[in-house]
């Protein structure tokens, strides 16, 4: 798998190993590979896992493969019913991720999207978007992506966070934020190849900075950015060693995971009845 770029010109961006991912050893190995490839490893809880086991699995006394805080892993529960019987939710998530990438873009979340081909779930879960204590939302609070099935909704993927949540509060705990960062970092690194070994001068620096700014300015996946030399370095010393330190900042678009409303009943609009007379 690590030879994908050498052979095909591209690395895998989603790693899924159905059934084998039920052990912590395999899940850990998936996350290691995902870290090398700048990918996301999708791992599912074993078949037969109960809700309580899934939640406990995130803690030190857990007995399943969910004891991780990796920013390269995403955890899924429960198994779903499909054409082949019980099927891994992680497998369906991988397919949905690719479908979403192609049809909307890599910065769109797979959460709250219909799971095609899914006709049931191994474990029934209460699901209400406006109830923080519903079982689907309780799973999300523990960094577990699940299935939302409420009245008239069908079966939908539900959850945005990577396994590093809730330990890590940085926005990179959103899967889409991590993937946006991966695309940007990889694109800039590959672009910079054409500048390697050219003379360090104003023309090189201006071209580098200008081109990166132009690239970031075309992205629909971010809401803002900045690019400059990295002044945390001693630039004269860096240039003398053949190094050109750059620093770019960006803010990815994040999913609207919760929409809150403040409902206020007031008498003040009764004045409209008077003003209209």
Regions of interest found by a model, annotated:
Residues 35, 150, 220-222, 239-241:
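A generic structural signal for short, non-catalytic loop/turn and secondary-structure boundary residues
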Residues 21, 233-235, 254:
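Residues that cap or initiate secondary-structure elements
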Residues 204-226:
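Short, hydrophobic/π-rich interface segment
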């Amino acid at each position: 798998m690590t030879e994908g770029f050498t052979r095909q010109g591209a690395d895998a961006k989603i790693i899924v190993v159905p059934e084998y991912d039920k052990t912590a050893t395999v899940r850990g190995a998936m996350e290691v590979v995902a870290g090398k490839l700048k990918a996301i490893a999708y791992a599912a809880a074993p078949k037969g896992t109960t809700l309580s086991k899934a939640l406990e699995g995130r803690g030190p006394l857990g007995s399943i493969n969910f004891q991780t805080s990796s920013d390269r892993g995403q955890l899924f529960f429960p198994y779903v019913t499909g054409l082949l019987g019980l099927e891994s939710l992680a497998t369906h998530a991988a397919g949905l991720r690719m479908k979403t990438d192609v049809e909307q873009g890599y910065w769109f979340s797979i959460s709250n999207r219909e799971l095609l081909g899914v006709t049931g779930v191994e474990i029934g879960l209460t699901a209400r978007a406006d109830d923080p204590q519903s079982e689907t939302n309780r799973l999300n609070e523990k960094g577990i992506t699940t299935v939302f099935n409420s009245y008239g909704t069908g079966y939908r993927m539900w959850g945005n966070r990577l396994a590093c949540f809730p330990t890590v509060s940085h926005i990179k705990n959103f899967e889409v934020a991590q993937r946006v960062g991966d695309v940007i970092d990889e694109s800039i690194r590959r672009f910079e190849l054409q500048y390697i070994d050219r003379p360090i001068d104003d023309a090189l620096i201006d071209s580098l900075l200008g081109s990166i700014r132009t690239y970031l300015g075309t992205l629909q996946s971010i809401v803002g950015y900045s690019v400059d030399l990295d002044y945390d370095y001693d630039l004269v010393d860096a240039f003398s060693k053949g190094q050109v330190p750059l620093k770019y900042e960006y803010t990815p678009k994040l999913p609207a995971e919760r929409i809150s409303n403040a409902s206020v009943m007031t008498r003040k609009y009764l004045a409209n009845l008077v003003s209209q007379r």
